[in-house]
Swiss-Prot record:
Annotated transmembrane regions: 7-27, 56-76
Assembly notes: F-type ATPases have 2 components, F(1) - the catalytic core - and F(0) - the membrane proton channel. F(1) has five subunits: alpha(3), beta(3), gamma(1), delta(1), epsilon(1). F(0) has three main subunits: a(1), b(2) and c(10-14). The alpha and beta chains form an alternating ring which encloses part of the gamma chain. F(1) is attached to F(0) by a central stalk formed by the gamma and epsilon chains, while a peripheral stalk is formed by the delta and b chains.
Top-level taxonomic group: Bacteria
Name under which the protein is recorded: ATP synthase subunit c
Keywords, sorted A to Z: ATP synthesis, Cell membrane, CF(0), Hydrogen ion transport, Ion transport, Lipid-binding, Membrane, Transmembrane, Transmembrane helix, Transport
Organism: Clostridium botulinum (strain Hall / ATCC 3502 / NCTC 13319 / Type A)
Family the entry assigns: Belongs to the ATPase C chain family.
Length: 79
C-alpha cells in the first residue's frame, strides 16, 4: 500500500469524524431552543432573561461545530 494514499485516506476519515461535531451542536441547540420556547410560554414576563441565556448558550454550542469544521478543513487541505 502506498503510504501517501494511506495518509490521505486517514485524513479524509478524520475529517468525517471531526465533522460529526456538527451533529452534537445541532441537537444541543435544538433542545435548548425547545426548552426556551417552553419557558417563555410558561412565564412570558421572563422572556428577556430566557432569550439572553439562550443566545449565550447557543453561541457556546455552535462554537463546538465551528471547531469541528475547522479541524475537518485542516485535515482535508493538509494545512
Amino acid at each position: 500500500m502506498d503510504p501517501k494514499a494511506f495518509v490521505s485516506g486517514m485524513a479524509a476519515l478524520g475529517a468525517g469524524i471531526a465533522a460529526l461535531a456538527c451533529i452534537g451542536a445541532g441537537i444541543g441547540t435544538g433542545n435548548a431552543t425547545g426548552k426556551a420556547v417552553e419557558g417563555v410560554s410558561r412565564q412570558p414576563e421572563a422572556s428577556g432573561k430566557i432569550m439572553s441565556t439562550l443566545v449565550i448558550g447557543s453561541a457556546f454550542s455552535e462554537a463546538t461545530a465551528i471547531y469541528g469544521l475547522i479541524i475537518a478543513l485542516f485535515l482535508i487541505f493538509k494545512i
